[in-house]
Amino acid sequence: MATSSSAFDDEFPMEEGMPELLDDEDVPSTLPSLLEQNMDTALKSNEFKLVKRKRRAGNAVDVVMEDISQPDDSTTDSPDADAEQKPTKRSKGSKGESRVVPVPKHRYTPLKDNWVNIFTPIVKNLGLQIRFNLKKRQVELRNPADREDTTDLQKATDFVRAFILGFEVNDAIALIRLDHLFLETFEIADVKHSLKGDHVSRAIGRIAGKDGRTKLVIENTTKTRIVVANTKIHILGAYQNLKLARNAVCSLILGSNPSKVYGNLRNMASRGAERL
């Protein structure tokens, strides 16, 4: 186990000499919505980059390329040959395709309280059909009968699944409006399988921190959202931010001091700001 811990430290180095406690001024009281935090990243990724034209050398000579291939009159003139050469367009899914998201018992009440906020963007913005099957205890989503594209259907499924896992509606809805967000789930045993009993509870306590401060700092610094559900960790965010948050959570599970993890995150966040 020592070798795995040292290998992890090499990948995610910890800084020495950090204070033992977090400063109160560094801990935000409330977090903005995940959509607002990642909107700037989405806009920057869509901006055009100005590419300067390279100067042409004075002794450069234009080279004219000639096509020496002889076209076959029998194939070019026939419309049937052109039809055979064109690839057929494949549909992404069948018409009226559906998705199912199971709902555990402890999420019945939150789902009922937030049902209006859930089905409104799915029905009005995406144009899908949704219902909660009480008998089978699952949320069912379906494409319209005249639509084959399943992109919106998959977005709506990820949105509902994120809410069922424990994320707030205002954070989970970012999966519908932004394309660069991902949802990752892993267990504490996947990081350190030797943890059992009270040691698992201590690892969960290190992730959350006193009054949830450690988790709040990680979320605010990495622009992600974290849900700790029993021994499972769910992280929602962009790919690079999700990687930073996952490394921070894994460091806490392996026993690193929260102040050191926070200091390392703060330095990485400052480096990212300098690059932008």
Curated annotation (Swiss-Prot):
Classification via CDD domains: KH-I_PNO1_rpt1 (cd22391), KH-I_PNO1_rpt2 (cd22392)
Q: Which family does it belong to?
A: Belongs to the PNO1 family.
Give me the ranges of the annotated region Disordered: 1-30, 62-101
**Summary of subunit composition and partner proteins:** Part of the small subunit (SSU) processome, composed of more than 70 proteins and the RNA chaperone small nucleolar RNA (snoRNA) U3.
Where does the record place Acidic residues bias?
8-27
Which keywords annotate this record?
Nucleus, RNA-binding
Could you tell me where this protein is found in the cell? Answer: Nucleus, Nucleolus
Residues in KH domain copies: 197-249
* Classification via InterPro entries: KH-I_PNO1_first (IPR055212), KH_dom (IPR004087), KH_dom_type_1_sf (IPR036612), KH_PNO1_2nd (IPR055211)
Name of protein: RNA-binding protein pno-1
Q: What intrachain disulfides are recorded?
A: none
Recorded hits in SMART domains, A to Z, give: KH (SM00322)
Which GO BP terms sit in this record?
A: ribosomal small subunit biogenesis
Example of a GO MF term:
RNA binding
Q: Which organism is it from?
A: Caenorhabditis briggsae
Q: Which GO terms describe its cellular component?
A: nucleolus; nucleus; small-subunit processome
Q: What does this protein do?
A: Part of the small subunit (SSU) processome, first precursor of the small eukaryotic ribosomal subunit. During the assembly of the SSU processome in the nucleolus, many ribosome biogenesis factors, an RNA chaperone and ribosomal proteins associate with the nascent pre-rRNA and work in concert to generate RNA folding, modifications, rearrangements and cleavage as well as targeted degradation of pre-ribosomal RNA by the RNA exosome. Positively regulates dimethylation of two adjacent adenosines in the loop of a conserved hairpin near the 3'-end of 18S rRNA.
Which positions carry the signal peptide feature in this UniProt record? Answer: none
Keyword Chloroplast tagged:
no
Gene3D superfamilies for the chain: K Homology domain, type 1
